[in-house]
Curated annotation (Swiss-Prot):
Its EC number is 4.2.1.17, 5.1.2.3, 5.3.3.8, 1.1.1.35. The keyword NAD applies. It comes from the Bacteria. GO terms for biological process: fatty acid beta-oxidation. Substrate binds at D298, N502. Involved in the aerobic and anaerobic degradation of long-chain fatty acids via beta-oxidation cycle. Catalyzes the formation of 3-oxoacyl-CoA from enoyl-CoA via L-3-hydroxyacyl-CoA. It can also use D-3-hydroxyacyl-CoA and cis-3-enoyl-CoA as substrate. The active site is at H452. The lineage of its organism: Bacteria, Pseudomonadati, Pseudomonadota, Gammaproteobacteria, Moraxellales. Keywords: Fatty acid metabolism, Isomerase, Lipid degradation, Lipid metabolism, Lyase, Multifunctional enzyme, NAD, Oxidoreductase. This is Fatty acid oxidation complex subunit alpha. Pathway: Lipid metabolism; fatty acid beta-oxidation. GO terms for molecular function: 3-hydroxybutyryl-CoA epimerase activity; delta(3)-delta(2)-enoyl-CoA isomerase activity; enoyl-CoA hydratase activity; long-chain-3-hydroxyacyl-CoA dehydrogenase activity; NAD+ binding. The gene is fadB. Residues 1-190 are annotated as: Enoyl-CoA hydratase/isomerase.
Length: 717
């Protein structure tokens, strides 16, 4: 054994070839944490000291290659400021450079995921051989940063600026064929041939049949483009990237382009310094803090879900009650992920509608070449439409998705319970109705749970799993595991009106209503909140949700929380409802909707909307300060999120933030309501609440925040 460290071993194979093997002890994956980087340095020194080594094959002892840097170390590193980040990165560059500069050929044998720092490790090798099962990529942009271990410098020299920018800005892992086509890897082989293929490449390089030094030299020099070609390449790249990423919201892509441009005409070492300086600028942004926090929160949510696996009973057969758009979407989602599902309704027209929805979604998958026609047929065969309960004795879980009316749901649920086994789980896809209330219609309330899908089901990643007063842990666990199997992210919440997401959303709509009442133009509110980072403003959002749905939900919330969700005035949303302007569903709401060239509903300004709401505007019509609009909208939403934590509706700030991002489109680069409060400053946020407390209870700071401010505490760190 030439080197035996905690993360890396080096041992001779044959013919002067050594295996440089990453296998981080005590971890399920390889990652570049501090310990691995130190071991990397020691392993390189051991290779340099051994004159018998003529070439290296770089391998992994895990099912993945290397998944990247240790993201949990970022917070501490990035909190030190730009200079400290550069001072941290430059020694890492020296270590990677010393491996690249070894006077012997090096081939990476990529057996699985090689992402971020993992692929940057592959780039310091002279050749890269990839298994057919592997994927490679530099996805750091998703974290609000960009590759910092030399990836931007080496990849742009290897595959050209245009391709490198696309790889890094899109942040999507590449499959073998795409990686080979772009020139990022040199060969793709079957998994069982990987080590042999990599070893053979090393032998060819040692024998001189391959000029590995010339291959390496390309990465050590400036980009091979003259100044005019460089200017054209970067102008094209900037146009494409900045059209998709607003630098005010996502600064990392522009900082990446700036550092690439600064380093393009420089040799490796100077270009790496430019990369480090640009990386440091990105790393200290609030967006990087929020997006890295989001990644860590995602891990927290997945870990919480995984804990339910042992308590779940298997779901070999599911059923959905109600074959509308929602029922059809649920059936499609289950079937497309391999779970057979019965779809029941009371009439053939309804069943036809549900099957049509599933068929349409599958057809789109085939058209986009994400599914083969034969797979579409197999998926449709897993959905069995029926008018009876005959087959329900074989069902492990039933998802009720009938109309959002408590009396209708109670009748359907009670009828269903009589037609299933005693241990069958019954889940209600309700968005606002109390699970504890609905459970009163059942003989076995312990088997009853809420399973709230968001519309459209195939696109929205979140599922709220709602625990009623008598819901068993087995019912929760089984529902969580099914949601995961369906490709969704489940978050378990306790029962209350609106559960978590809608309970938080309705005060946001309430804040909008109050702003309009006080004289704000709803278009200004929409523009301000869109620029703030929401996918759409609140007026447009309520049109998309459906104004009738919004009014019904508001009534449920007002009954549950009369002190802060029951206004003493009629607002613009209710005015639209009374005028039979329901939003997109009947083409008039706050906006008017007409089909565009692609057949999608596009909004246009409708003067009639202003006439409808005019009698309900009591304040003087004026242009509000943009920050006042942001503060009033965000305080109402964030305060209710904190109250959900106070009331133990949701267990952690991590889960609350993830739910708001996945469920209602909270701007990801702001990290969620709790992260937003942290970044505002808890004491400063409480002061804002006090400033607007005269507007009503929704604006009063929750006691949790006052306590946190008094003790200088934050949600994160």
């Amino acid at each position: 054994m030439i080197h035996a460290g905690n993360a890396i071993t080096v041992q001779m194979l044959a013919d002067g070839i050594a295996e440089f093997r990453f296998d981080l002890q005590g971890e399920s994956v390889n990652k570049f944490n501090r310990a691995t980087i130190e071991d990397f340095k020691a392993a390189i020194a051991a290779v340099k000291a051994n004159n018998d080594i003529k070439g290296l094959v770089v391998t992994s002892g895990k099912s993945t290659f290397i998944v990247g840097a240790d993201i949990t170390e970022f917070g501490q590193n990035f909190a030190q400021g730009e200079k400290a980040i550069v001072d941290w990165l430059m020694p890492v560059h020296e270590i990677f450079n010393s491996f690249e500069d070894l006077d012997l050929p090096k081939v990476a044998a990529i057996n699985g995921m090689a992402l971020g720092g993992g692929f940057e490790m592959c780039l310091v090798c002279d050749y890269r051989v990839m298994s057919e099962a592997a994927q490679v990529g530099l996805p750091e942009i998703k974290l609000g940063i960009y590759p910092g271990f030399g990836g931007s410098v080496r990849l742009s020299r290897l595959i050209g600026i245009d391709n490198a920018v696309e790889w890094m800005a899109m942040a999507t892992p590449k499959k073998p064929a795409a990686a080979l086509k772009d020139g990022a890897v040199d060969a793709v082989v079957a998994a069982d041939k990987l080590l042999d293929a990599a070893t053979d490449l090393v032998k060819q390089a040692i024998s001189g049949r391959l000029n590995w030094k010339a291959k390496r030299q390309e990465k050590l020099e400036a980009v091979k483009l003259n100044p005019l070609e460089q200017m054209m390449a970067f102008n094209t790249a900037k146009g494409a990237v900045l059209a998709k990423a607003n630098p005010a919201q996502y600064p990392a892509p522009k900082l990446l382009l700036d550092s690439l441009q600064a380093g393009a005409s420089l040799a490796r070492d100077e270009a790496l310094k430019a990369e480090a300086e640009g990386f440091a600028k990105a790393a200290v942004t609030p967006q990087a803090e929020a997006l890295i926090g989001l990644f860590i929160n995602d891990q927290v949510v997945k870990k919480a879900s995984k804990q339910h696996e042992k308590g779940a009973h298997p779901v070999n057969q599911a059923a959905v009650l109600g074959a509308g758009i929602m029922g059809g979407g649920i059936a499609y989602q289950a079937a497309s992920k391999g779970t057979p599902i019965i779809m029941k309704d009371i009439g053939n027209p309804q069943l036809a509608l549900g099957m049509k929805e599933a068929n349409n979604l599958l057809t789109k998958q085939v058209e986009r070449k994400k599914m083969k026609p034969v797979q579409m047929g197999e998926t449709l065969a897993r959905i069995r439409p029926t008018l009876s309960y005959e087959e329900f004795k074989e069902v492990d879980i039933v998802i009720e998705a009938v109309t959002e009316n408590p009396k209708v749901k109670e009748i359907v649920l009670a009828e269903t319970e009589k037609n299933v086994r005693e241990n069958t789980i019954i889940a209600s896809n309700t968005s606002t109705i109390s699970i504890t209330r609905l459970a009163k219609a059942l003989q076995r309330p312990e088997n009853f749970v809420g399973m709230h899908f968001f519309n459209p089901v195939h696109m929205m990643p979140l599922v709220e799993v709602i625990r009623g007063e008598k819901t068993s842990e087995e019912a929760i666990a089984t529902t969580v595991v099914l949601a995961q199997k369906m490709g969704k992210t489940p978050i378990v919440v306790n029962d209350c009106p609106g559960f978590l997401v809608n309970r938080v959303l309705f005060p946001y709509f309430g804040a909008f209503d109050l702003l309009v009442k006080d004289g704000a133009d709803f278009q200004q509110i929409d523009n301000v909140m869109s620029k703030f980072g929401w996918p759409m403003g609140p007026a447009y959002l309520i049109d998309v949700v459906g104004i009738d749905t919004g009014v019904h939900g508001a009534e449920v919330m007002a009954e549950g929380f009369p002190d802060r969700m029951k206004p003493d005035y009629k607002g613009a949303i209710e005015a639209m409802y009374e005028a039979k302007r329901l939003g997109q569903k009947n083409d008039v709401g706050f906006y008017k909707y007409e089909l565009d060239k692609k057949g999608k509903k596009a909004k246009t300004v409708d003067p009639t909307a202003y006439e409808v709401i005019a009698p309900f505007v009591t304040g003087e019509k004026r242009e509000f300060d943009n920050q006042e609009i942001i503060d009033r909208m965000m305080l109402a939403l964030c305060n209710e999120t904190v109250r959900c934590l106070e009331d133990n509706i949701v267990a952690t700030a991590s889960e609350a933030d993830m739910a708001m991002i996945m469920g209602i489109g909270f701007p990801p680069f702001r990290g969620g309501p709790c992260r937003y409060i942290d970044q505002t400053g808890v004491a400063e946020y409480v002061a804002l609440c006090d400033k607007y407390a005269h507007l009503g209870k929704a604006y009063e700071a929750p006691q949790m925040l006052r306590d946190m401010a008094a003790n200088n505490k934050k949600f994160y760190g």
